[in-house]
A protein has these predicted regions:
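Arg/Lys-rich, positively charged N-terminal/basic patches that mediate binding to nucleic acids
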Residues: 1-32
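Short, hydrophobic secondary-structure boundary micro-motifs
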Residues: 29-30, 50-52, 91
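Short proline/glycine- and basic residue-enriched helix-capping loop/turn segments at helix->loop/beta transitions
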Residues: 39-43
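Basic/aromatic recognition patch in beta-strand/loop cores that engages polyanionic ligands
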Residues: 44-78
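Enriched for short, Lys/Arg-rich terminal
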Residues: 67, 71-103
Length: 103
């Protein structure tokens, strides 16, 4: 199984890592490392996280107030959002129309 980010998810991941790195050197790298750790867990156990809408599942990051939202599409883990837990909780749903089928 492989993974890929939707372009919007990739951009918000990069923005969050830049933000954390600007706040304190090394924290941006810690954020990147945590996102990749969660992706590794998801790739090992893709159906373990709870479904939050249609085929989209959510996995919480440790030490950061973010969720990794993803869908399993054939042999690809499609990352829909790297979403802050306190900001605009459902903004990513508009991405589903073009990227996924809602069931």
């Amino acid at each position: 199984m492989i993974y890929e980010f939707l372009p919007e998810a990739d951009e918000e991941f990069r923005e969050a890592s830049r933000y954390y790195e600007n706040e304190a050197p090394g924290v941006g790298l810690a954020f990147i490392t945590e996102v990749h750790r969660v992706i590794s867990v998801v790739m090992l156990h893709p159906r373990a996280a709870k479904k939050v809408r249609g085929t989209v599942r959510s996995k919480v990051l440790f030490h950061f107030p973010y969720n990794l939202l993803y869908s399993i599409e054939s042999d690809v883990i499609l990352i829909v959002a790297v979403a802050h837990q306190k900001r605009r909780p459902t903004y990513w749903r508009s991405r589903l129309n073009t990227a996924l089928r809602i069931t």
